[in-house]
Amino acid sequence: MQLKIKEIFNQDYVKLEGQKIQIKAWVRSNRDSKKIGFLVLNDGSSLTNLQAVYRVDKIDNYEEIAAARMWAAVVIEGVIKLTPTAKQPLELEVLNAQILKQSDEDFLLSNNDLNLETLRLNAHLRPRTNLFHAIMKVRATLAFAVHEFMNQNEYSWLAAPLFTGNDAEGAGETFSIQKFDNEEFFGKQTHLSVTGQLQAEAYAQAFGNVYTFGPTFRAEKSHTNRHLAEFWMIEPEMAFVDLKGMQDIVEDLVKHVIKAVLEKNQQELEFLAQRNDENLIKKLQKVVESKFERIEYKDAVKILADAVKNGHQFENNEIFFGMDLGSEHERYMCETYHQGPVFLQNYPKDIKAFYMKLNDDQQTVASTDLLIPGVGELVGGSQREDSYEKLLKRCQELKMPIESLQWYLDLRRFGYYMSSGFGIGFERLVMYVTGVNNIKDTIPFPRSHGQIEF
């Protein structure tokens, strides 16, 4: 019978002893001593490798198999033998072996001294390392868990467009589409989308609860370990939900996806804990078990100012109401002051996007950021402005192109009572759950300023 390596190690070994099985896998290493050889095999189903022992008196093509190089594709038939005194609990005694495809001698990963930067430059090969195998397995679980949560809570998935005539964030950091045959293909200047939020609001007013989950683009000339030009966003939008209700949903979603990884990726998390952060699993368990604190922006400013007065040093020690908090301030709030996930809420309107609902104080908007230890901001969200007049006034204050946003304004004219939504940078979530330090290591083929290989 044909088995995956994961299936072999996930069942009772005793029942497998003496059974004849077939494995299709790649060679991780191969050593021989003329009469006996040892293949270390992996088929991608698990971080655990399977050792296969081949002997010159058991197979006809011993020399051919002895020449199998690292990452050669092979098919092996053999008998399971228990090895209770060895490092691995069992091995495969080879009866038949065949090289399906040999690997060239200059295979990059045969060099054990490769650093992460070299692997980023060879992103087509890095999934063959244990590190990126573990990261991408966790990423896959997180993505599935997002869809699972949304499906269980009756959200409809929306395929948001990637071409847009709007800049929803108003930051101007968009990729423009080139003219086609010396004319605007869509009849107007067009960009790659930075968010699917505006379109999600339109559908939330008909479906109630919707979400987008797909790629977005931002033309930031940033070379930090926290920025990508192409990244994935999770963007739910809920009708008849206020800021507090939206925060409850954020908390439930974050806990759900982290719990899914704790349940399904124990092996990967143990490997990542050894590689990146020895407290990784405890950190994730604490998030699942904790209650997310909620703190007013104005109170956070006072807390930070008091910290400076008491001798704490930030790179930016000028703390005042109206400032856009930096990562160092956000991390202080969730790592030092609260020591756990915390929502900051009701930010000044001048540092937030145009579509956020103006509070009664006329100074702040119904907005929130979820701050997570080790990352800072993970989630940003708000209750949306439901007044046509107030939204129009805000657009005019910011000198935004009213004509291209008229459809969005018009939503308020047709029963738009209340709507709230949030965005989660998926790669930042993967960073947090895996403990990696560079966001370029959380996406299969990273796109950033000056990098477009593969």
Swiss-Prot record:
Q: Which GO terms describe its cellular component?
A: cytoplasm
Q: Name one GO biological process term.
A: asparaginyl-tRNA aminoacylation
PROSITE patterns named among the record's database cross-references: AA_TRNA_LIGASE_II
Report the principal subcellular site: cytoplasm
Please, which domain of life does this record's source organism belong to?
Answer: Bacteria
Query: What keywords would UniProt list here?
Result: Aminoacyl-tRNA synthetase, ATP-binding, Cytoplasm, Ligase, Nucleotide-binding, Protein biosynthesis
**Gene Ontology MF annotations:** asparagine-tRNA ligase activity; ATP binding; nucleic acid binding
Quaternary organization = Homodimer.
Please state what the protein is called. Asparagine--tRNA ligase
- Organism for this UniProt entry: Ureaplasma parvum serovar 3 (strain ATCC 700970)
Coding gene?
Answer: asnS
